Swiss-Prot record:
The gene is ctaB. The chain crosses the membrane at residues 31-51, 58-78, 107-127, 130-150, 157-177, 184-204, 229-249, 250-270, 286-306. This is Protoheme IX farnesyltransferase. Converts heme B (protoheme IX) to heme O by substitution of the vinyl group on carbon 2 of heme B porphyrin ring with a hydroxyethyl farnesyl side group. The keyword Cell inner membrane applies. One of its GO terms (molecular function) is protoheme IX farnesyltransferase activity. It is found in: Cell inner membrane. HAMAP family: CyoE_CtaB. It comes from Orientia tsutsugamushi (strain Ikeda) (Rickettsia tsutsugamushi). Coiled coil: none annotated. Belongs to the UbiA prenyltransferase family. Protoheme IX farnesyltransferase subfamily.
Amino acid sequence: MPNSHSTQSTPVKNFQNKFLVLTSTPKDFLLLMKPSVMLLAVFTAITGLFIAPNKIHPLLSSIAILCISTGAGAAGAINMWYDADIDSIMKRTRNRPTVTGKIPPSTALTFGIILAFFSVLVMAICVNYISSILLLISISFYIIVYTMWLKRRTAQNIVIGGAAGALPPVIGYSAVTNSIDTTCLMLFLIIFLWTPAHFWTLSLYYTNDYKLANVPILPLVKGINYTKYSILAYTFLTVISASLPYFTDIAGLLYLICSTISGIIFLCYASMLFNDRNNILARKMFKYSIIYLFNIFLYLIIEHCIKHFNIS
């Protein structure tokens, strides 16, 4: 285990940590929770809430969303605690609060554990046990399976670890239905297949960063071309999976048209990567992949509203 995870109990170190906590700002703690990741998780969870066949009281839905966002933030905080050593090496992550010293790693760990505990507990008490268990699985999977076990050991880390990020819509859906069915599993599948293509485009752009940090990403282990073919394959599978809501009568023709157009653009980006020698386009595809996923889930919400209000 990296040296940064060990705790020092000397009086001087304790005083320094307490002083840093006192000087930490709310913005520092917000950054600790990886707000961009948290927002995407929340939005996909809201989609799960929206398309669920049952109804839930607005207060309970708000509590569920709060628990999901807090749980995602908790996972992000603990991830930053564990990865503080490699984050300090990588250009992309060197400004994280656990690296700059704005928040001591031990404080990040404590903060994350407290958030995780209360998010799961409140979900169990106020919403239902199934959504609470799923939230616990999502947090644990991201921290233990992905961050601590897979990330530094295999280039397939994101393929397996991506399951954690694919759970929020299932949690949102189960918060309403108190069950799991093919509808929410379809949402899970879309995000699960989307995650590798999303992450590998970023890894193409930051290959040197990951090399310095000794993290076995796909471009380093299998090469650039293999990675680009893998991105194309997963992008294709994502686009196909995104059409499933139409063919299972969850969404209508409007959804199919919009998702297909977004999917074609996504595939065009993936195809053009082969002519992207400096990996500049890879970063653009990374940004578009976020827009793509947001749009797919937005289309589902719009379709649900059209059906609910009988808009013709």
